[in-house]
Amino acid sequence: MPLEIKWASTENNEVSDLLVVKLAENPDLVKAGIKIQRDAMSFDELLNWLYRDASQDAKYGVPTYNMFNLATGFTPWYDQKYTYSTKEEMIKMGYNTNYIFDKELEQAATDMVMVAPDQRDAFKDNFVKFVTRWNEMLPDLPLYSNQYHDFYNSKLKHWVTSEMKGLTATILDAW
């Protein structure tokens, strides 16, 4: 039986077009028995499918797609406790868009971030437990991410950014 993946993709998107060539039409995937069906749609519709938003239309509440190509900006705060929450109220707020309900993964994600800042060894141990369980479940398969760079005129003074300091704070300090 082949692995069939239903892919919700945004229309007029160069990355989606590249993924068609690299994934959907990849002869190695075809040989392995993997079939990827792309459905191109507007970004708003893709989000309705991602969040299973039946308030927009009952069809969105029915799990249909198991692949979405959306970029992510990785933050320096590696806190996944809500990303893999099994709590119904968190899911209603838009967390756990993978709909992977695994108590062990949720607990590992929570344990990882609930240690005191000076407990580095405990954090490392918990991180390994989380990543091990994450790899067993493989709820996400990252294909690409955003990387941000700042380019500015050398006349600009006090433009100091970091992964911890947002754009709005940076603008306020610059002149």
What residue ranges belong to the model's regions?
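Short, solvent-exposed loop/beta-turn-alpha elements that line the ligand-binding surface or hinge
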Residues: 1, 49-59, 82-115, 145-175
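Soluble non-cytosolic domains of exported or imported proteins
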Residues: 10-18, 41, 96-103, 117-125
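Solvent-exposed loop/turn segments at secondary-structure junctions
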Residues: 10-15, 43-45, 72-77, 148-151
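Sec-exported extracytoplasmic/periplasmic mature domains
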Residues: 24-34, 51, 55, 73, ...
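Periplasmic binding protein-like
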Residues: 29-90
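Surface-exposed patches in mature extracellular/periplasmic domains of secreted proteins
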Residues: 34-41, 122, 140, 145
